[in-house]
Regions:
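Structural recognition of an alpha-helix C-terminal capping motif at a helix-to-coil junction
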Residues: 31, 45-52, 65-77
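Sigma70-family region 2
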Residues: 11-12, 48-66, 85-86
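Amphipathic, Lys/Arg- and hydrophobic-enriched alpha-helical face
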Residues: 22-40, 57, 118
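Short amphipathic alpha-helical boundary/capping segments
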Residues: 5-10, 113-121
Length: 147
């Protein structure tokens, strides 16, 4: 069945079509939630909320661009919405050195290690990091997203 037909059936609340869309895209979308979340449990909550939003708004997809890109944007916006109303970034008042030297061999850094470091950042810092470094948004765009 074509993706366009699946999308239209999802808009009509066809459960089989929704299940097929879920099976096609759940892996990629969960990885997005994982990178924006503190831990796996929070990622699962964000993932579930994101898919609910996708299926609620799927009728708004206009077939002008990539459906996968649209779903990624909905998923990221769902996660960001949860964090927008949280406390603002705390400004660090202690002296911060101009340069920090870290001596780590590139071969020693694993993907799990990096993911763990990112997940341990405070919520808003993690959001900014992901949006800037991983998704390529400008600081101006990020500022608008987080307002």
């Amino acid at each position: 069945m074509s993706l366009k037909k699946l999308i239209k059936q999802c808009a009509d609340n066809d459960r089989k079509a929704q299940e097929e869309i879920y099976q096609l895209f759940s892996g990629k979308l969960f990885s997005i939630c994982l990178k924006y979340s503190k831990n796996k449990q929070e990622a699962q909550d964000n993932f579930q909320d994101g898919f609910v939003t996708i299926f609620e708004k799927i009728g708004q997809f206009k077939f002008n661009g990539s459906f996968e890109g649209w779903m990624k944007r909905v998923m990221i916006n769902t996660v960001l919405l949860k964090y927008r109303n949280k406390t603002v970034l705390n400004i660090v008042t202690e002296d911060i050195p101009d340069e920090v030297i870290v001596d780590i061999d590139d071969d020693e850094i694993s993907l799990d290690f990096l993911l763990n470091l990112i997940q341990n950042l405070p919520d808003r810092y993690r959001m900014v990091f992901n949006l800037y470094v991983l998704d390529g948004h400008s600081h101006k765009e990020i500022s608008k997203m987080l307002q």
